[in-house]
């Protein structure tokens, strides 16, 4: 069975841990003849190759029309050339579109109209934070242009996937997709890099590497650290905890202002390891007792859950409440130094409460956030 992942709304890049990289790789593992069609500005004339995961990648020639250089017209012009012809050549059984925000997607609709038996799925990552509707013109633009694309896709799509509850809501209220066609498809962690069977050994090894006692209560956080991530508040909250057995492990790049604020506070119990790759994140999660992500969302939230880790997260008015699978997570609306301190202290002091969270994290949430399971759900296979 042949599946084509259509990645036109964004540029396709190899070697990243994004959903558009991982889902096709998982479909290869599941035995599907897996293709990606996209574009990359380094290959203006297009190219074809098979990558290390066994995915057949076709980068289409870029549309170099003068209209693509005009700010107010660029969104009305196709980014690529030859998408319909590519579909005609490959004749997929399944199409999975990553993001509908490209006029090129209408070429897929045209092909689906001709081939009624194809199974079409669409996901999207836009929400009220990363694609804010701050002007009437923006709202009209999204509703008219992207709403039209969504309407055409709705004629053929089996399912529109939002990757968070917020993005499910956005599909319906902004793009006008009918609720019965929308569902949640979470992001997750790549089980290929999660050494679950040897997690105790991984835990011991990582803690030795960073000089963290084996019996310490280890909190972890990180990512692209700017003020919106609120990791500076987490550092202050941990500093206030009098229990010397608590440690905080932070990873990721810091903006200049966060470096100036946070780095003087890095000491014996607060560890900073700098930037690490997405693959290197998983052992750190396995070595930890609690993740805390008190700011803006990133896929690190779901990656920590895929490692069976209980967590504390910022509550964005229910926009990311999918992280709670029945008790593995605490969601805090008002993130302050004090609210973080209180909740971390609570879990340290109340072992029964923490153990219950950990059990749910390991035996329920973990499976839900593994990409092999997400890849099956994405295209309705068992």
Predicted regions and their residues:
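Short alpha-helical donor nucleotide-sugar binding micro-motif in glycosyltransferases
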Residues: 275-276, 282-288, 304
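Donor nucleotide-sugar binding/catalytic pocket of nucleotide-sugar-dependent glycosyltransferases
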Residues: 119, 146-201
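Conserved donor-binding/catalytic core segment of Leloir-type glycosyltransferases
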Residues: 4, 161, 213-229, 235-238, ...
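N-terminal subdomain of nucleotide-sugar transferases
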Residues: 1-45, 49-56, 239
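Nucleotide-activated donor-binding/catalytic signature segment of Leloir-type glycosyltransferases, i.e.
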Residues: 259-280
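Membrane-proximal helix-turn-helix segments that form the acceptor-binding/catalytic region
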Residues: 22, 110, 114, 128, ...
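Acidic donor-binding loop of glycosyltransferase active sites
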Residues: 286-296, 309-310
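Glycosyltransferase donor-sugar binding loop
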Residues: 189, 222-226, 247-260
């Amino acid at each position: 069975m042949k599946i084509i992942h259509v990645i036109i709304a964004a540029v396709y890049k190899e070697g990243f841990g994004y959903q558009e990289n991982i889902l096709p790789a998982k479909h290869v593992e599941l035995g599907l003849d897996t293709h990606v069609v996209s574009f990359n500005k380094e290959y203006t004339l297009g190219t074809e190759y098979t990558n290390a995961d066994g995915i057949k990648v076709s980068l289409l020639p870029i549309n170099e029309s003068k209209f693509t250089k005009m700010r107010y017209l660029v969104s009305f012009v196709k980014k690529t050339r030859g998408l319909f012809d590519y579909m005609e050549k490959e004749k997929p059984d399944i199409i999975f579109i990553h993001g509908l925000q490209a006029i090129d997607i209408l070429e897929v609709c045209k092909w689906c109209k001709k081939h009624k038996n194809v199974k079409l799925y669409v996901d999207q990552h836009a929400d009220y934070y990363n694609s804010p509707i701050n002007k009437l013109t923006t709202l009209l633009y999204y509703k008219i242009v992207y709403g039209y694309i969504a309407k055409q896709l709705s004629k053929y799509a089996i399912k529109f996937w939002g990757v968070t509850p917020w993005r499910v809501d956005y599909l319906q209220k902004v793009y006008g997709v009918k609720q019965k066609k929308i569902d949640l498809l979470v992001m997750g962690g790549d089980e290929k890099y999660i050494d679950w069977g040897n997690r105790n050994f991984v835990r011991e090894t990582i803690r030795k590497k960073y000089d963290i006692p084996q019996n310490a209560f280890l909190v972890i956080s990180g990512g692209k650290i700017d003020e919106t991530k609120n990791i500076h508040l987490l550092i202050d909250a941990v500093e206030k905890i009098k229990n010397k057995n608590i440690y905080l492990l932070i990873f990721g790049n810091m903006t200049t202002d966060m470096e100036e604020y946070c780095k003087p506070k890095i000491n014996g119990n607060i560890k900073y390891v700098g930037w690490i790759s997405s693959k290197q994140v998983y052992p750190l999660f396995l070595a930890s007792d609690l993740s805390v992500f008190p700011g803006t969302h990133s896929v690190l939230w779901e990656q920590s859950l895929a490692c069976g880790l209980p967590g504390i997260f910022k509550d964005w008015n229910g926009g990311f409440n999918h992280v709670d699978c029945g008790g593995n997570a605490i969601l805090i609306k008002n993130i302050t130094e004090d609210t973080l301190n209180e909740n971390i202290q609570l879990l340290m002091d109340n072992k029964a409460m923490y153990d219950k969270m950990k059990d749910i994290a390991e035996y329920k949430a973990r499976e839900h956030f593994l990409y092999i399971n997400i890849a099956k759900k994405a295209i309705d296979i068992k």
